[in-house]
Amino acid sequence: LPIHIPKEHLEQWLVQSIGAKPVGSGNYPVDVIDVNENFGADAKMLAWSGKPGSASNETSLLQKFKDAGNELDIAFKQNKFDGVVSDWARLLKKKLNKVKKDYEKIQKIYYFFLIREDRNFHLCGMEVNVEKLSLISVDKSSKSSVWIKDFIESRYGESKIYKSKKRMELRLYPSN
């Protein structure tokens, strides 16, 4: 059986390994902050098959589309995908800027990923350039999803908005 690690343990490992301070207990945009190093970070756990070129499972980046003031199902039905992506970008930017507002010294936001490949683990991270979130756009779309261009380089992963789950998700390509 694969190893299962509770999110709380992952967060604590991150706190201990980088000397940061835990925040939010799951109800905040990031899991840790380091005001001395001026960053906040969110810890994410992903599973991956290990097959070269394959994607990991998904992790949620944002789930509160109702705050956009639009009805996601209607936007999909009317093929208003540019509006869907710009609404999600605005909401994600607002979510992450809350950290910078609450902690004035925070300048950078990171995602740290622990990727489980059976019994092996890989660690990677990415900086989120919050100011460039307004530049993301539609890559392609279907009746139930919108793939996002320019959130992450396509060789490293893909980001998608799922209509049915009403959330924005990220998958990584760990072998790349």
Model-inferred region functions:
Residues 1-28, 45-176:
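Nucleic-acid endonuclease domains
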